[in-house]
């Protein structure tokens, strides 16, 4: 069975975000992209445009010095929607933080128009970033 093209796009987006690749994100995200981010990681809130997504993920990459291990549990697509679940392990100064995170993506044709990111880290996880 082949992979849905929107799943491929989500995988490309993840790689681009973690790599800070704004040029690739410009081809993946719609011009009016919206990002909704909830959880105990830095900078929760609502953002417009790829810069907001890069700002949020950039803070996490900076705090962990890139010590981020993501394991996609599933990623499924139908019509203009994608749902994804991942297990993340972040490392910082000899400590580790694990979370199970949920993502929902709304597509406009072949580009991501809106993204919801919900961090499933345990209570008190904010201290990991201080």
Residue ranges and their predicted role:
Residues 1-31, 130:
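Short, low-complexity N-terminal intrinsically disordered segments enriched in polar/charged residues
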Residues 2-5, 54-130:
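A beta-strand edge to alpha-helix "cap/lid" segment located at domain peripheries
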Residues 24-78:
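A solvent-exposed, acidic/Ser-Thr-rich amphipathic alpha-helical stretch
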